[in-house]
Structures are given as C-alpha cells and as structure tokens.
Design a protein with these regions (language model features):
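Mid-domain Rossmann-like dinucleotide-binding core that forms the NAD(H)/NADP(H) cofactor-binding site
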Residues: 1-47
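Short, well-ordered alpha-helical microsegments
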Residues: 7, 31, 51, 75-76, ...
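Glycine-rich phosphate-binding loop and adjacent beta-alpha segment
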Residues: 25, 73-145, 178-181
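Local beta-strand N-terminus motif with an aromatic residue
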Residues: 39, 62-63, 106, 146, ...
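Short amphipathic alpha-helix with an adjacent loop that forms part of the alpha/beta core around
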Residues: 49-60
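Short conserved AdoMet
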Residues: 58-59, 83, 170-171
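N-terminal Rossmann-like NAD(P) cofactor-binding module of classical short-chain dehydrogenase/reductase
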Residues: 66-67
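C-terminal capping/lid region of NAD(P)-dependent oxidoreductase domains
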Residues: 138, 143-152, 160-181
C-alpha cells in the first residue's frame, strides 16, 4: 500500500534518511506517483507475487525491513524477500488476519515479526510517541522536506463519500474529513 497515507509518508521518510524504498501498489499510475515521490521501485500487486521482483531489485541478500499494512495475504512474499535478521513490521490487516507461516524460514533467516498499532497502547506511550514526532518529524514538515499527501478534503458531513473514495481504491495519500466550527 505504497500509495496510502502511511505509504506516502514512509516513502518520504526513507528518501530523507537515504534508505532504499520498494513499494507495492494497486495500479501503474500509483506506482508512477510513488516513484515520483521518492520510491526506488515497485510492483503492481495484481500482477502476482512480488517476492522475485523484490529479490531481483535488492539482490540476493534481500531487504532489511518490510512495513506491511496488508497482513495475511502478503506473509509468504514478505518472508521470502527479507534478508537474514530482517524485520517484518505488520501495521494493518487489509489482506486478512490468519495465514500459514513457514516457521522453518522464520528460524533459518532469524526474522523478527513485529505487530504494531497505536490503538492498544496506553496514553502515556502515545504521548511519548507524539513527543518524538514533534522533535523529529515536525521540523521536516514545517520546512517542506516532507509533505503530507492528501487526495481529498471533505466536510465531515460527507463521510460516506470519503468512505466511497477510499473503497474505490483509486486514492493517492489521505482522504481527510474536515470538522468546522
């Protein structure tokens, strides 16, 4: 989901920190826009498995980190393209919650699987994360080095339309609901 709000932010953060970035997206236009934003390469998910493409791109070693908002349906490809000692960070479950896992591959590659969500964290931890964002990210937002990518801004009264936009899977970046007053 390189064209999602989180994906577009990750692309910019990786570019800013001089780290390579490979994305998966829903169509060629989204891939083009991700590359324009700073992704090094990518793959249209409807074209099958991305593991071989990532391996060719990254070389035999594979990639160090996968940030995965998809979950179950990407698990096999994610594990295949990670390097020994790599980390799989699961931040969403758009592709399902349950899957079979090749535990032998996990063990042989010493892969760490990390699940992460803000929802389950205590307020004190969320506050600490916000403080870190203010210190490390806000200056880059203020300077324009990193820009939030916003597809549409709609009044909160048009929340249903916002959901339809997102469900249509043609957006690039965030859809924002604006509350006035």
């Amino acid at each position: 989901a390189g064209a999602s709000g989180v994906g577009t932010a990750a692309i910019q953060l990786l570019k800013f920190s001089h780290n390579p970035c490979f994305v998966t997206v829903g169509n060629n236009d989204k891939l083009r826009r991700c590359v324009e934003l700073g992704a090094d390469s990518g793959f249209v998910r409807h074209n099958g498995s991305f593991a071989k493409i990532v391996s060719d791109w990254a070389g035999d070693a594979g990639v160090d980190v996968v940030l995965d908002p998809v979950g179950a349906s990407y698990m096999e490809d994610n594990l295949s393209c990670l390097t020994a000692g790599g980390r799989l960070v699961i931040i969403g479950l758009l592709g399902g919650q349950k899957t079979d896992v090749n535990l032998g591959l996990l063990m042989m590659k010493r892969i760490a699987v990390i699940g992460s969500t803000l929802r389950a964290r205590p307020i004190s931890e969320k506050s600490r994360i916000m403080d870190e964002l203010k210190e490390n990210l806000w200056p880059r937002l203020e300077s324009g080095e990193i820009k939030p990518i916003i597809e549409a801004v709609l009044p909160v009264t048009e929340a249903e339309k916002a959901h339809e936009l997102i469900a249509g899977n043609e957006t690039f970046g965030k859809v924002v609901l604006e509350v006035s007053g």
